[in-house]
Swiss-Prot record:
Cofactor: Mg(2+)
PANTHER family referenced in this protein's UniProt entry, alphabetically: BIFUNCTIONAL GLUTAMINE SYNTHETASE ADENYLYLTRANSFERASE_ADENYLYL-REMOVING ENZYME (PTHR30621:SF0), GLUTAMINE SYNTHETASE ADENYLYLTRANSFERASE (PTHR30621)
Catalytic activity from the UniProt record: [glutamine synthetase]-O(4)-(5'-adenylyl)-L-tyrosine + phosphate = [glutamine synthetase]-L-tyrosine + ADP; [glutamine synthetase]-L-tyrosine + ATP = [glutamine synthetase]-O(4)-(5'-adenylyl)-L-tyrosine + diphosphate
Short name of any one Pfam family annotated for the protein: GlnD_UR_UTase
Organism expressing this protein natively: Shigella dysenteriae serotype 1 (strain Sd197)
Alphabetical GO biological process terms: regulation of glutamine family amino acid metabolic process
Organism lineage string: Bacteria, Pseudomonadati, Pseudomonadota, Gammaproteobacteria, Enterobacterales
UniProt protein name: Bifunctional glutamine synthetase adenylyltransferase/adenylyl-removing enzyme
Length: 946
C-alpha cells in the first residue's frame, strides 16, 4: 500500500488521541496505522477490544479463513445456555470477523472476490448457527416437529439477493424466506403444537436473535418481505404452500429475486433438493423468454423513478451504469435462456458473466469491461461501507472520506478516482442500453422552425405570430402571448440554474409547437404553465419532458382534457414519471392486483420509517388515480369500471394502513392474547356508502366503522399490557391518524366514522355483539338503509361472517309497509331540504329530485320492504346489482329496473366527468330531463302511492 495522503496523515493525529494506553502509537505496526486511519468502525472495535488488534498482528487475515468460521463460532457458542448469551456471542463474533475482513480489504491483502465470499459465508455461518441452536431449544420446549410418518421436520432458510449469490456487501441487511417441508405436529413436548405454530414461533425468535439491537449491536438487519404475500403473509410456509403460491401467483419480480435464492447450511439434504427442484421451473422457463427484457426494463424504470423520488445522486448501486445495471444485464441472459442453458443457472454474477461470454451471447470485450467495472464498483462500495459499518452506496461529500476512498482505491486524489469511476459506469450504461435500453427509440422530430424558438424567446412582434398561430382567434392569440410573457416573468423570480435554463430553452419550443396546434391552445397552455411553474427549479422533471417527447404529448393531452389532472400533476410532480409508459398510463392496474402492486411498492421503503411509509402510500394512490382518470378520459373505462377501480384501490389502502397500524400497536403493547386460540386479528373494517356500494368517485371520502370480537377479560401479551378493548380502540385511532396525516403528498383519504352506533357520541370501535344489539333494538330506519350499502372491506373470515349474518338478519326483519314508506320518504325530504340544490335554474345531480339519491332510496326501501320474503335481496351492497335482484325476484319489472340502472349509471358518469373538469355536481336545469322524469315516476310508484 502506498503511504497515507496528506489529509489522512493529519487525521492520524486525531486517531492517536482516541487510542487507549494498550494501543499506544509506538506499539502499532505500519499496517495498523493505515487501517485505523481509514476505518472508524475498526477504530471503535479495537478500542473496545484491544485483543482483536493483537490477534490481527499475530494472525493476519487469510483468503481462505472463511473455512474456519463455523468451527470458530461453534467454540464461541459452546458455553451458551440461554438466548441472551446466544445473542451476545453472535454479535461479538460478527464484529470480530468483520474487523478482520475490513483489515484485509483496506490493505488489499485478498481479492475482491474473496472479500465477497467471506462476507457472505460469515452471514450464512451466523444464520445457520442461530437457527440450529434455536431449533434444539424449541424442540426441548415444545417437542420436535414431525410429519405424518413421524419424521423430524427442519426449518429451511432461503438466502435471497446478494446473500444467496455469495456477493454480500460489507454493511448489508439480509433477505430471507423460511420454509418447512410437511404438515404435522410436535412430538415429545409438554403439549402438542402443529408444525405451522412451531416454525412461526421459532422464526420469530430467530429474527429477534439476529435483528434486535442490544448493547453489542445487532447481527444483521433481517428483511422478510420477499416471502409470499409479503409482510401480510405467514412468516413460514410449508413446501406445498410455497409451490401453490409461485405456480398461481408468482410475479415477475419474485422470479428475478429467486434467481439468487440459496439454501443456507446443508444444501444437499433430501429436503433441500426437493425445495430446489420445486422452485426451478418457476425461475427458469423451458422456452426462450424474451418478455424478460421488457419486464427488466420496467423494473429499471421503477428504480430510476425511485432515484429521482429520493433525490439520490452519486449512487454507485442504483445510478446509471451502477451495480444494479450490471446485475440486470446478467439476469437478462439467465432468465431468457437459463431454462435451456443450465450453465446460466448460477446464483453468482461473475461466473455467470463468464458463461455468457463463452456462449457468445455478447462480446468478450463487453464481458471483460463489465467484470472489471463490477469488481471496481463492489470494492468501492465495500470500502465506503466499512468506514462506519454503514449501509450506503452514495459517494461522500466530505473531504476526509473522499481522501480515505481515493487512498484505499489506490488513486492520488478524488478527481482521479471519480474519473475512472465515470469511465467504468459509462461502459456499463452503454452495454445496458444496447441490451435493455428502450426498444421504442423515439424518432426525433424535425428541427422546429425558428419561429417557435423566437416565440418562446419573446423575439416575435404580435403581428409576426399570425403565421404560427393562424388557426387561433385573435383573442386566443393574445391570450397565448400573455401566458408566455407571464410565464417568463414568473421564471425571473425563481432560482433556476444554467442547466435548468438550458433544458427549458430546449423544451418550450417543442411544447409550444404541440400546444398551439390545438384549437384549445389558450386553455391548455394556461394549465401547463401553471404546472411548469411548480417544477422549474427541479431540473430532473424538465429533463423528463424534454428527453421523452411521448411523455410531453401525454401531458398536453391529459391537461387539455382535465383540469383535475393538471392540478394533480402540479401538486404532485412525481406523477410525471407515470407519463413515460402509455401501457400503464392508460391501462390501470387490474382490479384484483392493487394489493399486490402496493405491496411491491412498499417493499422499497424501510418498514420502520413511518414517514416514508405514509409518503409512499399517498404517492401510490396519486399514481393510481392518475391512471384511472387517464383511462376514463380515453374512454377505455366505463363508469362502473371507474368506480370499481377506485374502490379496489381504496381497499388496498385500507389493508396497508391496518397492517401498518397493527404492527405499530403490537410492537407497543403486544398481541391480544385471545388470538392465540383463533385465526385472524379479531378486527374488521366495515365500509358504508359509496365504498360499501362499490361506487367511489375521484374525491370520495370513506365511511368506515370498526368492529372487534374480543372477550371481556382479554389482555395483550406485551410488556406494556393493556385491556384488549383499549388495544382495538387505539388501533382504530391509529388507523384514522394514518389516513388523515398530511404529508407533502397530501392526506390519504378523508375518513368519516359517524355511521357507527350512536354516531359521533358512540365508541370509535364497537364489539360485534354490541353492534348487532344496537341494530336490532336502537337503530333508526335510516341506519338500516345505510346497512343496505355496507360490507366488510377488511377483516378475518370469522368476524366477516358474523357481520354478514347480522346484516342479513336486520335487512330481512319484517316491516310494516306503510310505516317504512313514510319513514324513508320523510328522511329523503329532510335531506332534500338540507342538501338540495340552492342554485337557480340548475339541477344537482346527486341531491335534487329525480337524481342519484332518489334511486338509492328506492333500492334501499325495496330491500328493507321485501327482504323478509326474498332473502336473496340482501346479497349485494351496490345499487346496480340490487336493481338486478329486484327484477330477478319479481319485485320490480325488468323494464323499470333497466331504466333506473341506465339513469343511475348515466348520472354517475356525468359526476365523474364533472370531477375531472373540477366542476361542481350540478348542471343546467334542462339536462337529463328524460332520466329525471323516469326516476320521479318510480319514486311516485314506490314511495308515495298507497
Amino acid at each position: 500500500m502506498k503511504p497515507l495522503s496528506s489529509p489522512l496523515q493529519q487525521y492520524w493525529q486525531t486517531v492517536v488521541e482516541r487510542l487507549p494506553e494498550p494501543l499506544a502509537e509506538e506499539s502499532l505496526s505500519a499496517q495498523a496505522k493505515l487501517v485505523l486511519t481509514f476505518s472508524d468502525f475498526v477504530q471503535d472495535s479495537v478500542i473496545a477490544h484491544p485483543e482483536w488488534l493483537m490477534e490481527l498482528e499475530s494472525q493476519p487475515p487469510q483468503a481462505d479463513e472463511w473455512q474456519h468460521y463455523a468451527a470458530w463460532l461453534q467454540e464461541a457458542l459452546s458455553n451458551v445456555s440461554d438466548e441472551a448469551g446466544l445473542m451476545r456471542e453472535l454479535r461479538l463474533f460478527r464484529r470480530r470477523i468483520m474487523v478482520r475482513i475490513a483489515w484485509a480489504q483496506t490493505l488489499a491483502l485478498v481479492t475482491e472476490e474473496s472479500i465477497l465470499q467471506q462476507l457472505s459465508y460469515l452471514a450464512e455461518t451466523l444464520i445457520v448457527a442461530a437457527r440450529d441452536w434455536l431449533y434444539d431449544a424449541c424442540c426441548r420446549e415444545w417437542g420436535t416437529p414431525c410429519n405424518a410418518q413421524g419424521e423430524a421436520q427442519p426449518l429451511l432458510i432461503l438466502g435471497m439477493g446478494k446473500l444467496g449469490g455469495g456477493e454480500l456487501n460489507f454493511s448489508s441487511d439480509i433477505d430471507l424466506i423460511f420454509a418447512w417441508p410437511e404438515h404435522g405436529c410436535t412430538q415429545g413436548g409438554r403439549r402438542e403444537l402443529d408444525n405451522a405454530q412451531f416454525f412461526t414461533r421459532m422464526g420469530q425468535r430467530l429474527i429477534k436473535v439476529l435483528d434486535q439491537p442490544t448493547q453489542d449491536g445487532f447481527v444483521y438487519r433481517v428483511d422478510m418481505r420477499l416471502r409470499p404475500f409479503g409482510e401480510s403473509g405467514p412468516l413460514v410456509l410449508s413446501f406445498a404452500a410455497l409451490e401453490d403460491y409461485y405456480q398461481e401467483q408468482g410475479r415477475d419480480w419474485e422470479r428475478y429475486a429467486m434467481v439468487k435464492a440459496r439454501i443456507m447450511g446443508d444444501s444437499e439434504g433430501v429436503y433441500a433438493n426437493e425445495l430446489r427442484a420445486m422452485l426451478r421451473p418457476f425461475v427458469f422457463r423451458r422456452y426462450i423468454d424474451f418478455s424478460v427484457i421488457q419486464s427488466l426494463r420496467n423494473m429499471k424504470g421503477m428504480i430510476a423513478r425511485e432515484v429521482r423520488r429520493r433525490g439520490l445522486t452519486d449512487n454507485i448501486k442504483l445510478g446509471a451504469g451502477g451495480i444494479r445495471e450490471i446485475e440486470f444485464i446478467v439476469q437478462v441472459f439467465q432468465l431468457i435462456r437459463g431454462g435451456r442453458e443450465p450453465s446460466l443457472q448460477s446464483r453468482s454474477l461473475l461466473p455467470t458473466l463468464s458463461v455468457i461470454a463463452a456462449l457468445h451471447l455478447f462480446s468478450e470485450n463487453d464481458a471483460k469491461q463489465l467484470r472489471v467495472a463490477y469488481l471496481f464498483l463492489r470494492r468501492l462500495e465495500n470500502l465506503l461501507q466499512s468506514i462506519n459499518d454503514e449501509q450506503t452506496q452514495t459517494l461522500p461529500s466530505d473531504e476526509l472520506n473522499r481522501a480515505r476512498l481515493a487512498w484505499a482505491m489506490d488513486f492520488a486524489d478524488w478527481p482521479q478516482l471519480t474519473g475512472v469511476l465515470t469511465a467504468h459506469m459509462t461502459n456499463v450504461r452503454r452495454v445496458f442500453n444496447e441490451l435493455i435500453g428502450d426498444d421504442e427509440s423515439e424518432t426525433q422530430e424535425e428541427s422546429l422552425s425558428e419561429q417557435w424558438r423566437e416565440l418562446w424567446q419573446d423575439a416575435l412582434q404580435e403581428d409576426d405570430t399570425t403565421p404560427v398561430l393562424a388557426h387561433l382567434s385573435e383573442d386566443d392569440r393574445k391570450q397565448v402571448l400573455t401566458l408566455i410573457a407571464d410565464f417568463r416573468k414568473e421564471l425571473d423570480k425563481r432560482t433556476i440554474g444554467p442547466r435548468g435554463r438550458q433544458v427549458l430553452d430546449h423544451l418550450m419550443p417543442h411544447l409550444l409547437s404541440d400546444v398551439c396546434a390545438r384549437e384549445d391552445a389558450a386553455v391548455t397552455l394556461s394549465r401547463i404553465t401553471a404546472l411548469l411553474v411548480g417544477i422549474v427549479t427541479r431540473t430532473t422533471y424538465l429533463e423528463l419532458l424534454s428527453e421523452f417527447p411521448a411523455a410531453l404529448k401525454h401531458l398536453i393531452s391529459l391537461c387539455a382534457a382535465s383540469p383535475m389532472i393538471a392540478s394533480q400533476l402540479a401538486r404532485y410532480p412525481l406523477l410525471l414519471d407515470e407519463l413515460l409508459d402509455p401501457n400503464t398510463l392508460y391501462q390501470p392496474t387490474a382490479t384484483d392486483a392493487y394489493r399486490d402492486e402496493l405491496r411491491q411498492y412498499l417493499l422499497r421503503v424501510p418498514e420502520d420509517d413511518e414517514e416514508q411509509q405514509l409518503e409512499a402510500l399517498r404517492q401510490f394512490k396519486q399514481a393510481q388515480l392518475l391512471r384511472i382518470a387517464a383511462a376514463d378520459i380515453a374512454g377505455t373505462l366505463p363508469v362502473m369500471k371507474v368506480s370499481d377501480h377506485l374502490t379496489w384501490l381504496a381497499e388496498a389502502m385500507i389493508d396497508a394502513v391496518v397492517q401498518q397500524a397493527w404492527v405499530q400497536m403490537v410492537a407497543r403493547y403486544g398481541k391480544p392474547n385471545h388470538l392465540n386460540e383463533r385465526e385472524g386479528r379479531g378486527f374488521a373494517v366495515v365500509g358504508y356508502g359509496k365504498l360499501g356500494g362499490w361506487e367511489l368517485g375521484y374525491s370520495s371520502d370513506l365511511d368506515l366503522i370498526f368492529l372487534h370480537d374480543c372477550p371481556m377479560d382479554a389482555m395483550t401479551d406485551g410488556e406494556r399490557e393493556i385491556d384488549v378493548r383499549q388495544f382495538y380502540l387505539r388501533l382504530a385511532q391509529r388507523i384514522m391518524h394514518l389516513f388523515s396525516t398530511r404529508t407533502s403528498s397530501g392526506i390519504l383519504y378523508e375518513v368519516d366514522a359517524r355511521l357507527r352506533p350512536s354516531g359521533a357520541a358512540g365508541m370509535l370501535v364497537t364489539s360485534a355483539e354490541a353492534f348487532a344489539d344496537y341494530q336490532k333494538n336502537e337503530a333508526w330506519t335510516w341506519e338500516h338503509q345505510a346497512l343496505v350499502r355496507a360490507r366488510v372491506v377488511y377483516g378475518d373470515p370469522q368476524l366477516t361472517a358474523h357481520f354478514d349474518a347480522v346484516r342479513r338478519e336486520i335487512m330481512a326483519l319484517p316491516r310494516e309497509g306503510k310505516t317504512l314508506q313514510t319513514e324513508v320518504r320523510e328522511m329523503r325530504e329532510k335531506m332534500r331540504a338540507h342538501l338540495g340544490n340552492k342554485h337557480r335554474d340548475r339541477f344537482d345531480i346527486k341531491a335534487d329530485e329525480g337524481g342519484i339519491t332518489d334511486i338509492e332510496f328506492i333500492t334501499q326501501y325495496l330491500v328493507l320492504r321485501y327482504a323478509h320474503e326474498k332473502p336473496k335481496l340482501t346479497r349485494w351492497s351496490d345499487n346496480v346489482r340490487i336493481l338486478e335482484l329486484l327484477a330477478q325476484n319479481d319485485i320490480m319489472e325488468e323494464q323499470e329496473a333497466m331504466v333506473l340502472t341506465r339513469a343511475y349509471t348515466t348520472l354517475r358518469d356525468e359526476l365523474h366527468h364533472l370531477a375531472l373538469q373540477e366542476l361542481p355536481g350540478h348542471v343546467s336545469e334542462d339536462c337529463f330531463t328524460a332520466e329525471r322524469d323516469l326516476v320521479r315516476a318510480s319514486w311516485q310508484k314506490w314511495l308515495v302511492e298507497e
